[in-house]
Amino acid sequence: MSVQLDAYLFFPGNTEQAIGFYQQVFGGQVTITRRRDVDPTATPEQRNQVINALLTGGDITLRASDREDTSISPQTRVELSLIGTDDARLRAVFDGLAGGGAVLAKLERQFWGDIFGSVIDKYGIGWQVNIGTAGA
């Protein structure tokens, strides 16, 4: 049996906008479940909260939700790493993620032989992009 890792991201009330941004970058389909869809006891303030957003297809699977926890900050999140050999696709993804964000390291050839760069997107999520050579 194979193992698959899906990233699950938490946002302070703007999950729908964030997952829409990632859909523009990666492609795929989005499914959103709001608290009102599954919790009949939700207060009026909670009804529109995204309790699960799922982006599937395209290059990746991402899951996300709104979280009321105010301790969430870019410093408490992880960086996501994209690794592959499709140079054109990974460069386009890098540029898409950089839109409205900040490039920390330009895509450049590194001492280990691959092209690597990193960016923090406009939602504060860090991304590492590593473009390897085919067959490596």
Regions found by a protein language model. Give the residues of each.
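Short, well-ordered beta-strand elements within core beta-sheets of diverse protein domains
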Residues: A7-F10, L80-I83
